[in-house]
Amino acid sequence: MTLVIGLTGGIASGKSTVSSMLLEKNFPVIDADLIAREVVEPGEKAYDQILEAFGKEIIQNDQKIDRPKLGSIIFTDEDKRKQLNAIVHPAVRNRMLTKRDDYINNDVPCVILDIPLLFESNLGYLVDKTLVVYVDEDIQLTRLMKRNEYSEKEALDRIKAQMSLKEKADLADIVIDNNQSVEETKLQLDNVLQKWNIS
């Protein structure tokens, strides 16, 4: 029987680092962010819906969506963010389910669904166990400002747009504390995999 793990965290919490560690161990990882990019490509149903909802001004010369421009709209307008999520989330969920079920049908021991908004989108029912990558907010803020060259306000707006990592940690089956070194995070992940008998 396949164990389905929901991996989540917050922006700049280190979730992608843990996801990469799982890939290195040859676990199949279904990445919601990658799928979210796929489903909004020209020719996809969600692309047409976004164009209809937000207008041509968010389209680049190559006909792809101008993600920074769309991002600046949705991070300052909650109604617009909800509107975008109502288009993108179902498309992402359906594609993730198809991929997950393919792995289950092929009897893989474990599959990871890497979903940043696992709890916000009420997607816990898609997985058997939840794993949250946690980091203190001050470290999260510093990492995000450095990584994306955001001002403190821009970084805080993006952090506040998501459920807090403390709330996510309370909902998780297991939490990986990513405040320390990458080596420490790797050690914690190894312990989790052993605990769940999938190392």
Curated annotation (Swiss-Prot):
Where does this protein act, in terms of pathway?
A: Cofactor biosynthesis; coenzyme A biosynthesis; CoA from (R)-pantothenate: step 5/5
Q: Which SUPFAM superfamilies does the entry link to?
A: P-loop containing nucleoside triphosphate hydrolases
Catalytic reactions on record: 3'-dephospho-CoA + ATP = ADP + CoA + H(+)
Single GO cellular component annotation? Answer: cytoplasm
State one Pfam family annotation.
CoaE
Where is this protein chiefly located? cytoplasm
- Name the GO terms of the biological process aspect: coenzyme A biosynthetic process
Which residues does ATP bind?
A12, S13, G14, K15, S16, T17
Q: Domain DPCK: where?
A: 4-199
Q: Which keywords accompany this UniProt record?
A: ATP-binding, Coenzyme A biosynthesis, Cytoplasm, Kinase, Nucleotide-binding, Transferase
- Compartments where located: Cytoplasm
| InterPro entries linked | Depp_CoAkinase, P-loop_NTPase
Q: Name one GO molecular function term.
A: ATP binding
The EC number on file is: 2.7.1.24
- Work out whether the entry's keyword set contains Transferase: yes
The UniProt entry, under PROSITE patterns, shows: DPCK
The protein's matches in NCBIfam families, at most eight in alphabetical order, are given as: dephospho-CoA kinase
Describe the function of this protein.
Catalyzes the phosphorylation of the 3'-hydroxyl group of dephosphocoenzyme A to form coenzyme A.
Similarity comment: Belongs to the CoaE family.
Protein name per UniProt? Dephospho-CoA kinase
Say which species the protein is native to.
Answer: Oceanobacillus iheyensis (strain DSM 14371 / CIP 107618 / JCM 11309 / KCTC 3954 / HTE831)
The root-end lineage is: Bacteria, Bacillati, Bacillota, Bacilli, Bacillales
